[in-house]
Amino acid sequence: MNENEGIIIENINNDSGSTYLMNILGILIPIKIVVTIYLFSKARLPVGFARYFGRLYHFMTNPIRLGLQIAGLRGPFISQLDDNVYLGAMPMGSDVTLLFYKYKINSIVNLCDEYQGPTQHYTQYGMQQLYVPVVDHFEPDVEIIEKSIQFILKQIELGNRVYIHCKAGRGRSGAIAICWIAYSRRVSLEVAQKILLEKRKIVRKQLYKQKNVNQYYSSYCLNSNINSTTSI
């Protein structure tokens, strides 16, 4: 075998090794992405990593989310909880007019860490936003729940209507909503969950079991006169 033949064989071996490596990476990378998304959806990623991954995931998937929302495949955009409080999905700039004119909403509680909201549109309509960012799929802590409830109370005293939202109006904002119902109606968390599901069927069905929801309830609601039989 001459020198040229040796070089050719070496190049072939290198090309084969590179192709094999690319094939392995082509299998491992999609698996890693799928596993990361799964762990993210179950709040099993470290919160610091989940925060940055959630922002990237929102940027990559928001067009799909908007399409599904428009098609009505993600449930209702907005649901009314009582005379003054609404719960729903994250609003885009084009939704602010709807919130302001149709629903007479002028106060917002935004729990999206990944999205600060259409703040310029809020300013245009004189709407006030309480921004309490919580990483997607994680539960708001007790301080955030209490801060949100106090904001809602203050806005109602001022004659304003409030819109609570996260990305889909299911989990993070659902935790605020169930605490609001338990606090304002003086009912148990189990009853509050039933009321909330009647108002918005797509909220998480186990909100009343969440740790911080129960801690808030014990600290701020339990000493009130609880009516465990209040009708929906």
Swiss-Prot record:
Superkingdom of the organism of origin: Eukaryota
Positions annotated as active site in the UniProt record: 166 (phosphocysteine intermediate)
Catalysed reaction, written as an equation: a 1,2-diacyl-sn-glycero-3-phospho-(1D-myo-inositol-5-phosphate) + H2O = a 1,2-diacyl-sn-glycero-3-phospho-(1D-myo-inositol) + phosphate; 1,2-dioctanoyl-sn-glycero-3-phospho-(1D-myo-inositol-5-phosphate) + H2O = 1,2-dioctanoyl-sn-glycero-3-phospho-(1D-myo-inositol) + phosphate; 1-O-alkyl-2-acyl-sn-glycero-3-phospho-(1'-myo-inositol-5'-phosphate) + H2O = 1-O-alkyl-2-acyl-sn-glycero-3-phospho-1D-myo-inositol + phosphate
GO CC, one annotated term: Golgi membrane
Residues of the Tyrosine-protein phosphatase domain: 77-222
Cellular compartment(s): Membrane; Golgi apparatus membrane
Pathway terms, separated by semicolons: Phospholipid metabolism
Membrane topology note: Single-pass membrane protein
Null mutant phenotype: Mutants fail to aggregate to form a multicellular organism under conditions of low cell density.
Enzyme Commission code: 3.1.3.-
Spans traversing the lipid bilayer: 20-40
Gene Ontology biological process terms in this record: phosphatidylinositol catabolic process; phospholipid biosynthetic process
A Pfam family this chain is assigned to: DSPc
SMART domains referenced in this protein's UniProt entry, alphabetically: DSPc
PROSITE patterns membership: TYR_PHOSPHATASE_1, TYR_PHOSPHATASE_2, TYR_PHOSPHATASE_DUAL
Listed GO MF terms: phosphatidylglycerophosphatase activity; phosphatidylinositol phosphate 5-phosphatase activity; phosphoprotein phosphatase activity
Keywords: Golgi apparatus, Hydrolase, Lipid biosynthesis, Lipid metabolism, Membrane, Phospholipid biosynthesis, Phospholipid metabolism, Protein phosphatase, Transmembrane, Transmembrane helix
Something else known: Dictyostelium phosphatidylinositol phosphates (PIPs) are unusual, with the lipid chain joined to the sn-1-position of the glycerol backbone by an ether, rather than ester linkage. The composition of the inositol phospholipids in Dictyostelium is strikingly biased, over 95% of the PI, PIP and PIP2 pools contain the C34:1e structure, with an ether-linked C16:0 chain (palmityl or hexadecyl) in the sn-1 position and an ester-linked C18:1 chain (11-octadecenoyl) in the sn-2 position.
Biological role stated in the UniProt entry: Exhibits phosphatidylinositol-phosphate phosphatase activity. Has a preference for phosphatidylinositol 5-phosphate (1,2-diacyl-sn-glycero-3-phospho-(1D-myo-inositol-5-phosphate)) in vitro. May be involved in membrane trafficking by dephosphorylating phosphatidylinositides.
PANTHER family recorded: PHOSPHATIDYLINOSITOL PHOSPHATASE, TYR_PHOSPHATASE_2 DOMAIN-CONTAINING PROTEIN
Family of the protein in this entry: Belongs to the protein-tyrosine phosphatase family.
Protein name: Phospholipid-inositol phosphatase
